[in-house]
Amino acid sequence: YYHLSYWGRPHDYMWLCTTQPGLIYNEMKQAYDHNAREVWIVNVHDLKPAAYDLELFLDMAWDINSVTGTTLNNHLEAWLCREFGSQAGKKLLPAMLEYYRLCGIRKPEHMGWTQVELSNRKVHPRGRSQVINTEFSLTEFGGELDRYLESYEKIKTTVTEAEKLVTPDRKDAFYSHIKYQVFGASAMA
């Protein structure tokens, strides 16, 4: 049973699909290596943002050897090219790899650093702890917050450029599978 989305404590993540393909590969390969080979179940809340992660999961469930640790990026690139055309797909690959890297640092849904029902936090009347600012530093580590935000701006620019290469019949899919996620994550960063 694998979560591409999660609803529960201390934080859910159901709005975007931010699970890195490398994590999916590693955990599902581990499950397979420990003899979980008959039934794989995936929890996914919104299919459109999770389209690639879901396909990766299903490809591995069908044939564990269809993807390896060294061909994972090729798998993503092939999916991007199939869905949005070769030019757009190749342009999107570095942006999507960076998107997953940034989401691995901190899930966009978790940027407020809010926790629920924890005794070590000041609790608001609604039962949730107080929202506090991110602990990304403006000054330490060479301005990590600025680097984080600049990284999102760069991938937004790449996504916007790639969108121009997408045929009109694929624009809706592009929005729901790529642009919505990147721009949504950036807005919360």
What positions do the PLM features span?
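Catalytic-core regions of glycoside hydrolase
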Residues: 1-67, 71-77
